């Protein structure tokens, strides 16, 4: 009779007992660290885009904020903002509109979809307007219309050229007919500025569409555009469904507009300050 029993050389696992594994934390990559280029679809490290926000692979021109535009365009420290504090009265009492405005102000740091003021660009004093598509797609409401109108009126009195960077998804639907009347209102101010013999330069940026395109964006004495910018009135699908025809692949791109005479020149972002200053000087310069 054996005094000692032979031990098994393996361990027994109860199949009915659940084995819980500790969840492993997944590495998190901040959303703002990388961007996908809409042009070539490359994933790009944000720092590789540089301050100009240009794709290093295909030279696609990314959209930028009004603050970024100021930093790239004007002489440092020369911007003096005008017409701040104007607020929409929400004429239609559109549901959720005031909440939307408050959210956009907090998110963008802007009060409205356009920044207006005066600045020096390579030593030339200009009345400057910059529309920012980050604010409700830079849609044109009563405040946008009022600020741009006042900019032209101020420039007319002070005998300044106007430089306007346009970007917009069109009229602001939350303000109805009040937003549409801004087209005529701004155009009248543009005409008075022109009658005074003053220079108006527009730079079309991505996207410039709707009522903005149908009015002051295309009324400049000279019209420039950034590369590959979308510029048009109605959307591509709306037009195709209306005319029952397929449109060219590059339809409504800045290059297409240049080819058909709607734009005077396409200028790379890095070249815009020098180009703007040269055109202002060519048209008499600024009085200051």
Swiss-Prot record:
Provide the alphabetized UniProt keywords: ATP-binding, Cytoplasm, Fatty acid biosynthesis, Fatty acid metabolism, Lipid biosynthesis, Lipid metabolism, Metal-binding, Nucleotide-binding, Transferase, Zinc, Zinc-finger
**Zinc finger (C4-type) residue numbers:** 37-58
Q: Which GO biological process annotations does it have? A: fatty acid biosynthetic process; malonyl-CoA biosynthetic process
One family name in Pfam for this protein: Carboxyl_trans
Instruction: Give the residue range of the signal peptide.
Output: none
According to the UniProt entry, its GO molecular function terms are: acetyl-CoA carboxylase activity; ATP binding; carboxyl- or carbamoyltransferase activity; zinc ion binding
Instruction: Output the Gene Ontology cellular-component terms.
Output: acetyl-CoA carboxylase complex
- Keyword Transferase recorded: yes
Pathway(s) served: Lipid metabolism; malonyl-CoA biosynthesis; malonyl-CoA from acetyl-CoA: step 1/1
Concerning Gene3D superfamilies, the annotation shows:
2-enoyl-CoA Hydratase, Chain A, domain 1
Q: Which domain of life is it from?
A: Bacteria
Reaction catalyzed: N(6)-carboxybiotinyl-L-lysyl-[protein] + acetyl-CoA = N(6)-biotinyl-L-lysyl-[protein] + malonyl-CoA
| Cofactors (names) | Zn(2+)
> Family assignment?
Belongs to the AccD/PCCB family.
Against NCBIfam families, the record matches this protein to:
accD (TIGR00515)
According to UniProt, the name of this protein is Acetyl-coenzyme A carboxylase carboxyl transferase subunit beta
The organism is Streptococcus pneumoniae serotype 4 (strain ATCC BAA-334 / TIGR4)
Phylogenetic classification of the source organism:
Bacteria, Bacillati, Bacillota, Bacilli, Lactobacillales
Query: Which gene does this sequence derive from?
Result: accD
């Amino acid at each position: 009779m054996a005094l000692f029993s032979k031990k098994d050389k393996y361990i027994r696992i109860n199949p009915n007992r659940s084995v819980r594994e500790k969840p492993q934390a997944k590495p998190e990559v901040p959303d703002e660290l990388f961007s996908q280029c809409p042009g070539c679809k490359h994933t790009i490290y944000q720092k590789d885009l540089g301050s100009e926000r240009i794709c290093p692979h295909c030279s696609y021109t990314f959209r930028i904020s009004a603050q970024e535009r100021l930093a790239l365009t004007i002489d440092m420290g020369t911007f003096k903002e005008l017409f701040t504090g104007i607020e929409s009265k929400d004429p239609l009492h559109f549901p959720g509109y005031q909440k939307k405005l408050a959210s956009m102000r907090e998110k963008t740091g802007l009060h409205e979809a356009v920044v207006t003021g005066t600045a020096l660009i390579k030593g030339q004093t200009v009345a400057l307007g910059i529309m920012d598509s980050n604010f409700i797609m830079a849609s044109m409401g009563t405040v946008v219309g009022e600020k741009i109108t006042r900019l032209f009126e101020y420039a007319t009195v002070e005998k300044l050229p106007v430089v306007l960077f346009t970007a917009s998804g069109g009229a602001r639907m939350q303000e109805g007919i009040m937003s549409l009347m801004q087209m005529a209102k701004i155009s009248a101010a543009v005409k008075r500025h022109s009658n005074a013999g003053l220079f108006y330069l527009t730079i079309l940026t991505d996207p410039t569409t709707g009522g903005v395109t149908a009015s002051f964006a295309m009324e400049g004495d000279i019209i420039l555009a950034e590369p590959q910018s979308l510029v048009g009135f109605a959307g591509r699908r709306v037009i195709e469904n209306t005319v029952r025809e397929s449109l060219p692949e590059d339809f409504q791109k800045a290059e297409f507009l240049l080819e058909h005479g709607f734009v005077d020149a396409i200028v790379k972002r890095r070249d815009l300050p020098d180009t703007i200053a040269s055109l202002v000087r060519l048209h008499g310069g600024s009085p200051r």
